[in-house]
């Protein structure tokens, strides 16, 4: 619903009762601003600016949003852009903690919107944006602590598009962002805020005056050196020498020199064994440094850089290799609490490493394929084993880690169309199947074990068994005691299975287990849930099971078609569409070719008419001729007619086709025509014509004569007899 401009101006005289209809009208009805007169335009802008100057927070917020809407009109932005910028900058400068935060966020968003509208237009950028840009950057940095997420994102965009103007503020912004990293609660910040801080720090090398790529490379190597120094602390708790490859991997990473220790981003750690919680500083430090390194190598830059993928993968391999299942604790670490904390820190480090590897696959895609075998090997180390079997209890305890593990493997499998070696994936398949198995609650399992143990002891008195009823429920309705599997785990496992069956030929054991799980889940989702809908991941998994049957001798198509009856892809298998028969279509290129074809058809019709005319004439004269003459004349025209018809038929059937004017839909085998010749027997000598009277028996047709006699009547000279 649109409001007339006069009513809009009237509403803006004072405090509008509701700004939503005004915003909707000015935003959707473009004709109002496109056809506005100069006087109405001035009234509209002045009244909106009066709202932004109002001390009332609602009016200030309404005026700020109205500025954002009217800036879509180029005429208003060109004529009043400087005034609009000035009022927004004043509101930003006067903001304090007593004002509602909505005023600050709407002001920053309006300024960013105006910058985006002006950016790229040389004259407006020079006259309006450039003079205000330094003031905007200064105010953003001063108000950073009020709304860090939106302001940091705004600063990152200004660094990207105006690196030269931002150069004087680079060191100040870097110091502010590193202050956030030093906070103890930084790891508890929201993920969008942490990601914005990491990416803004990674974009700062762009403001360098010369050789920004060298500054970027120096920052990346400094982060790798700092990560190495943090990971080396585990040598105080674990015997890293148990793994012979770990010392070699540490040697491959660069180290800080004596004069470079001040280049560290984070301060030194203080770990006290008497305070076991201080050990968590290791995983916190690894989390920050690894995510910052991730931002450097995955965030796009305006200049070319040389990414040290080899060193990055070595860092991740060291993190995954520091595993307490394969590396023993040192003898002086006897406190069980410290041991558990050290184990927890290694799990957290592995989780961050898996996320990093997944981001590398998304960013560099095919460039990661040469390292695929190495990556799968280091991920395989994270699968929990006990007595040569997967430890189910540990698997469930570290469910988040194993879920991310399968997700990372799925991403790397999506980079290839086929993988010949399936041995590295068998453990991951077993992990996925175990994660989606029905889970019995611990209390139920413990109660069941206690009952078994009590039955195996001494005989008790025959008192009433108080545990019979709950035990009977467990035996008869076990599915009601199963623990619900997280939806995120189910979706990731389904995606992983879909990626596996489409890229790898698994052994029969694992393949049949996957097929069994697929069918059970499909039937359950189709008939035993309230909505009777198949989830997207399960639908994709069912279709891939049909397309890639593996060792199945019997197709899953009938079962899957029953469950997914509306799928268009499966309908192709159930109702195959055969291709049409090849048809020759003449391709008329121009009018001259079309006219030539018409002329050929006319000539052909004319020839047929010429052939038919003598036949019609003979048919008229046949009744007047004697039988002997008729018999002789019937013989000759028939031979000529048969030859001509044969030639016409051959031209129609065996005409050579020009490939440039004919479209072939399918190759066909060339058929050679069988030539058949009609031999007409002619007498070797023709006797002299003798006048003979007509005989009734000679009227029999030669063609109907079955004895095939060689006798032929001589020609009768009818004309001569008539003249006489």
UniProtKB/Swiss-Prot annotation:
It is found in: Nucleus. SUPFAM superfamilies: ARM repeat. Residues 593-610, 704-724 have a biased composition (Acidic residues). It comes from the Eukaryota. InterPro entries: ARM-type_fold, RIX1_N. Pfam families: RIX1. The keyword GTP-binding does not apply. Residues 611-635 have a biased composition (Basic and acidic residues). One of its GO terms (biological process) is rRNA processing. Its main location: nucleus. Residues 444-464, 592-644, 656-724 are annotated as: Disordered. GO terms for cellular component: nucleus. Keywords: Nucleus, Ribosome biogenesis, rRNA processing. PANTHER family: PROLINE-, GLUTAMIC ACID- AND LEUCINE-RICH PROTEIN 1. Component of the RIX1 complex, composed of IPI1, RIX1/IPI2 and IPI3 in a 1:2:2 stoichiometry. The complex interacts (via RIX1) with MDN1 (via its hexameric AAA ATPase ring) and the pre-60S ribosome particles. Belongs to the RIX1/PELP1 family. Component of the RIX1 complex required for processing of ITS2 sequences from 35S pre-rRNA and the nucleoplasmic transit of the pre-60S ribosomal subunits. Regulates pre-60S association of the critical remodeling factor MDN1. This is Pre-rRNA-processing protein RIX1. The gene is RIX1.
């Amino acid at each position: 619903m649109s409001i007339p401009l006069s009513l809009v101006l009237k509403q803006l005289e004072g405090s509008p009762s509701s700004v939503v209809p005004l915003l909707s009208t000015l935003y959707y009805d473009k004709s109002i601003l496109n056809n506005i007169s100069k006087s109405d335009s001035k009234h509209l802008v002045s009244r909106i600016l009066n709202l932004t100057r109002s001390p009332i927070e609602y009016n200030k917020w309404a005026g700020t949003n109205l500025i954002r809407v009217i800036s879509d009109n180029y005429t208003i932005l060109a004529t009043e852009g400087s005034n609009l910028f000035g009022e927004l900058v004043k509101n930003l400068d006067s903001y304090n903690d007593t004002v509602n935060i909505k005023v600050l966020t709407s002001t920053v968003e309006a300024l960013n919107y105006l910058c985006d509208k002006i950016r790229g237009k040389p004259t407006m950028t020079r006259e309006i944006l450039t003079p205000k840009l330094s003031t905007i950057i200064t105010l953003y940095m001063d108000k950073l602590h009020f709304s860090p997420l939106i302001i940091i994102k705004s600063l990152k965009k200004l660094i990207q598009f105006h690196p030269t103007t931002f150069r004087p503020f680079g060191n100040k912004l870097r110091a502010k962002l590193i202050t956030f990293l030093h906070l103890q609660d930084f790891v508890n910040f929201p993920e969008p805020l942490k990601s914005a801080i990491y990416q803004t720090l990674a974009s700062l090398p762009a403001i360098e005056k010369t050789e920004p790529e060298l500054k970027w490379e120096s920052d990346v190597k400094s982060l790798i050196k700092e990560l190495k120094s943090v990971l080396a602390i585990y040598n105080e708790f674990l015997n890293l020498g148990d793994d012979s490859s770990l010392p070699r991997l540490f040697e491959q990473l660069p180290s800080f020199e004596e004069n470079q220790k001040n280049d560290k981003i984070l301060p030194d750690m203080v770990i006290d064994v008497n305070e076991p919680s201080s050990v968590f500083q290791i995983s916190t430090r690894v989390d920050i440094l690894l995510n910052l390194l991730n931002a450097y190598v995955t965030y796009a830059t305006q200049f070319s850089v040389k990414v040290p993928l080899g060193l990055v993968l070595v860092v991740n391999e060291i993190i995954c290799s520091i595993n307490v299942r394969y590396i023993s604790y040192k003898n002086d670490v006897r406190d069980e609490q410290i041991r558990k904390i050290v184990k927890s820190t290694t799990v957290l480090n592995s989780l961050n490493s898996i996320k990093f590897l997944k981001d590398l696959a998304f960013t560099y895609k095919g460039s990661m394929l040469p390292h695929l075998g190495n990556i799968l090997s280091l991920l395989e180390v994270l699968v929990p084993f006990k007595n040569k079997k997967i430890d189910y209890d540990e698997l469930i305890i570290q469910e988040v880690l194993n879920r991310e593990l399968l997700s990372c493997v799925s991403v790397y499998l999506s980079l290839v169309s086929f993988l010949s070696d399936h041995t590295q994936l068998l453990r991951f398949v077993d992990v996925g199947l175990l994660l989606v198995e029905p889970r019995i609650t611990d209390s139920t399992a413990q109660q069941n074990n206690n009952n078994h143990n009590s039955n195996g002891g001494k005989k008790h008195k025959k008192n009433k068994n108080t545990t019979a009823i709950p035990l009977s429920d467990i035996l008869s309705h076990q599915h009601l005691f199963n623990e619900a599997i997280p939806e995120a785990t189910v979706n990731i496992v389904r995606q992983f299975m879909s990626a596996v069956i489409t890229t790898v030929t698994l052994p029969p054991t694992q393949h049949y287990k996957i097929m069994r799980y697929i069918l059970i889940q499909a039937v359950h989702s189709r008939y035993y849930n309230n909505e009777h809908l198949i989830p997207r991941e399960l639908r994709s998994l069912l279709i891939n099971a049909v397309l890639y049957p593996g060792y199945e001798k019997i197709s899953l198509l009938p079962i899957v078609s029953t469950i997914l009856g509306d799928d268009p892809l499966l309908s192709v298998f159930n109702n195959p569409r055969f291709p049409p028969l090849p048809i020759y279509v003449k391709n008329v290129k121009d009018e001259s070719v079309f006219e030539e074809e018409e002329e050929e058809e006319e000539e052909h019709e004319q020839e047929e008419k010429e052939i038919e005319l003598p036949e019609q004439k003979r048919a008229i004269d046949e009744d007047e001729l004697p039988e002997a003459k008729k018999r002789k004349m019937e013989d000759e025209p028939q031979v000529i007619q048969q030859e001509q018809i044969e030639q016409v038929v051959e031209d129609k059937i065996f005409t050579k086709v020009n490939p440039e004017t004919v479209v072939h839909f399918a190759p066909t085998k060339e058929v050679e025509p069988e030539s058949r010749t009609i031999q007409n027997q002619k007498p070797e000598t023709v006797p002299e014509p003798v006048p003979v009277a007509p005989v009734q028996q000679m009227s029999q047709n030669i063609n109907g004569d079955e004895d095939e006699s060689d006798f032929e009547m001589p020609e009768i000279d009818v004309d001569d007899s008539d003249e006489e």
